[in-house]
A protein has these predicted regions:
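Beta-strand/beta-sandwich contexts
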Residues: 21-54, 106-120
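Immunoglobulin-like IPT/TIG beta-sandwich domains and homologous Ig-like subdomains
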Residues: 38-101
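Carbohydrate-interacting/catalytic domains
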Residues: 91, 104, 109-128, 179-182, ...
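Active-site-proximal helices and loops of the catalytic beta/alpha 8
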Residues: 236, 254, 327-329, 333-434, ...
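Structural recognition of the beta-strand scaffold that forms the well-ordered cores
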Residues: 129-133, 185-190, 218, 245-248, ...
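Bacterial N-terminal signal peptides
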Residues: 2-14
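Substrate-binding/active-site clefts of carbohydrate-active enzymes
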Residues: 127, 137-335, 355-362, 368, ...
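Active-site clefts of carbohydrate-active enzymes
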Residues: 436-457
Length: 627
């Protein structure tokens, strides 16, 4: 009797254990798709779900092979490598995951390759970039203004830190406006999926929302306030049809605090720190630049959380680095974008920047990536620019950096805080770069005050600042609204809605008939200088030669073997006469300096071996040379 009861008890316990063990479940697969004949092969999948302990994965088609399985301690993440035959055709290639408790299917696709002749075009000095914050540019689809789960207070145009309704469709609707302005590339701030709620914190910027896109909760998702993946693909297709390129803003450095990883990280060292215990980034870029800084002083800037609330990714963990590199390439291959702007690049390990750059260029030879190393010191920016190894032996191989140092000086010059000669003084630091022509120059930026709202900012100053930026070396970048001298103080006031992009706007600056007098003056000026740059290759790619400079004016040339264009800028409130030796440009006696149609000025003569310049007050002019 006792033996029978014992047997029954054992059977009961076994049944309970069997009932408690559950079959694996799949929540997300990253990346969800890949390509045959890709330079990354095998591709490393990260599968999120539950009950993966003891799992094995079985391909359902012979064109793919699976290896290197790794399950985290919580059995909620599964890493696996998928090798794809170069002969595999596009289609569905599901994988079976099997444990002793059951099976589940991992969805996976092989996608067709996009045409490389019309996609992945890269960016260079022939381009003019236009920065757009989708939420603040134009509302083209009212149906996504308040997505499911987004509270009313998160969607309010009266609140500068809430979602305003701008979206990808709004950008698509105004591509012809951008083409007519003359820009050639659009950079959109991140379209990653972000949390739809209202964020509360102890910082001055809370409560807020993540309308800006820099706090991803899904690296492979599109923010539902902005649209869908198909909307992004359509944007790229339509832009390419109009001769416009598209740049994606990527953020490998950090994610949002609402990312599912925060409560269940794939690996213990996926992040630097935890929500309860982490370092706040002190933004000590000087510690990164100096070879004499201690590792203890350097680590907080590399490992610290951005703004104390955006978890810092640990690219020194190989799985993290692989994940982020694949994510960058997936977006390029999936959408056909032409460039990447990499956020806060200086806070990531330099070897990771190098590996990311190499991976991009191996697969997409024309691909271009610009990094944000926000610092007023040219030595700091040059340290992150590709082309030369730093003190650590690492060449980041980064295509471009934003020229924040020159931008800050230009703003100070044209708001009368520094003498005009400061422009030339800053440009001498071009010697720090292997090739300063690869820098990306700025007219405006979404993290700073707009020019017209600076202390000392005026419409005429904004015009001179823009003329300088469009004619100096590098690839220029405008911020939406710069072309109409939009005002804007500190964040978030510098992210006002573009007038005319939203229902109920009092005027429409997308149309000449809808602009104010000030807006039209700035728009016409911007369009003319853009056209001048596009009409003359020498302005885009020629050598930069100093001719004359003092506290009030700067005259310089862009020259190549076939053409020379002279730019003369006078900040003074009074007309100014300047001379310079004709030998600076090897001009013979009698050569004529002819004002370009842009300004309509009369002919100037070279006499007595001197170039004679009569510069009107507060002016920027361009001259061509007739020998």
């Amino acid at each position: 009797m006792i033996g029978a009861l014992l047997v029954c008890a054992l059977i009961y316990v076994g049944a309970c254990e069997s009932a408690s063990a559950q079959a694996p479940t799949i929540t997300k697969v990253e990346p969800p798709s890949w390509w045959a004949a890709h330079t990354i092969n095998p591709v490393r999948l990260l599968v999120r779900g539950a009950n993966f302990r003891g799992a094995r994965v079985i391909p359902t088609r012979r064109e793919i092979q699976v290896s290197d399985l790794r399950v985290n301690d919580a059995a909620t993440y599964l890493f696996l490598s998928v090798r794809i035959s170069p002969f595999a055709r596009p289609g569905d290639y599901p994988l079976l995951i099997e444990t002793t408790s059951g099976r589940a299917t991992i969805p996976f696709k092989i996608e067709p390759q996009l045409d490389p002749s019309t996609n992945f075009q890269g960016i260079n000095a022939d381009d003019i970039i236009y920065l757009i914050m989708p939420d603040r540019f134009s509302n083209g689809d009212a149906s996504n203004d308040a997505p499911l789960g987004s509270p009313r207070e998160a969607n309010d145009r009266e609140n500068a830190r809430a979602y305003h309704g701008g979206d990808i469709r709004g950008v698509i609707n105004h591509l012809s406006y951008l083409r007519d302005l003359g820009v050639t590339a659009i950079w959109l701030t991140p379209w990653y999926d972000n949390w739809n709620g209202v964020n509360t914190c102890a910082h001055p910027w809370c409560p807020n929302t993540f309308y800006h896109g820099y706090a991803a909760i899904d690296y492979y998702g599109v923010e539902d306030h902005f649209g869908t993946l198909e909307d992004v693909r359509e944007l790229v297709r339509r832009a390419h049809q109009l001769g416009l390129k598209v740049i994606q803003d990527q953020v490998a450095n950090h994610v949002g605090s609402r990312h599912p990883w925060m409560d269940d990280p794939p690996l213990p060292d996926w992040f630097h720190g935890t929500r309860a215990s982490h370092t706040q980034n002190p933004f000590r870029g000087d510690m990164l630049l100096s070879p004499h800084a201690s590792e203890a002083d350097r680590r907080p800037t590399l490992d610290g959380w951005f703004a104390d609330e955006m978890p810092d990714m640990n690219q020194e963990e190989a799985e993290v680095a692989r994940y982020e590199i694949q994510n960058a390439l997936w977006w390029v291959g999936t959408t056909g974008i032409d460039g990447i702007r990499q956020d806060t690049i200086q806070y990531m390990p330099r070897f990771f920047i190098r590996e990311l750059s190499r991976a991009l260029h191996r697969q997409f030879q024309r691909m271009w990536m610009v990094g944000e190393a926000n610092d007023p010191d040219a030595a700091h920016v040059a340290f992150f620019m590709g082309g030369r190894a730093g003190w650590d032996g690492v060449d980041t191989e980064l295509d471009s950096d934003f020229d924040f140092p020159l931008w800050h000086v230009s703003e100070d010059v044209f708001t009368n805080k520094k003498p005009v000669r400061a422009l030339r003084d800053e440009l001498k630091y071009d010697a720090l770069y292997v090739d300063a022509t690869r820098l990306t120059t700025l007219v405006g930026n979404h993290d700073f005050r707009r020019f017209i709202s600076l202390n000392g900012g005026t419409l005429r100053g904004a015009m001179l600042h823009l003329a300088f930026t469009l004619t100096v070396r590098g690839t220029p970048q405008l911020y939406y609204g710069d072309e109409i001298a939009m005002p804007g103080a500190d964040d978030p006031d510098n992210r006002q809605d573009f007038p005319g992009g939203f229902p109920g706007d009092t005027h429409n600056a997308f149309l000449s008939s809808g602009r104010t007098g000030l807006e039209q003056r700035m728009y016409a000026w911007t369009r003319q200088w853009i056209q001048l740059r596009r009409d003359h290759t020498v302005i885009r790619k020629g050598r930069l030669i100093d001719i004359a400079f003092d506290d009030d004016a700067y005259i310089y040339a862009r020259a190549d073997d076939t053409e020379t264009i002279i730019i003369a800028i006078n900040r003074s409130l009074k007309p100014k006469k300047m001379t310079a030796p004709a030998s600076v440009l090897n001009l013979p006696e009698g050569a004529r300096l002819m004002s370009l149609p842009l300004t309509g000025r009369s002919i100037l003569l070279v006499s007595n071996h001197q170039m004679q310049f009569q510069l009107p007050a507060r002016s920027a002019e361009a001259f061509t040379i007739s020998r």
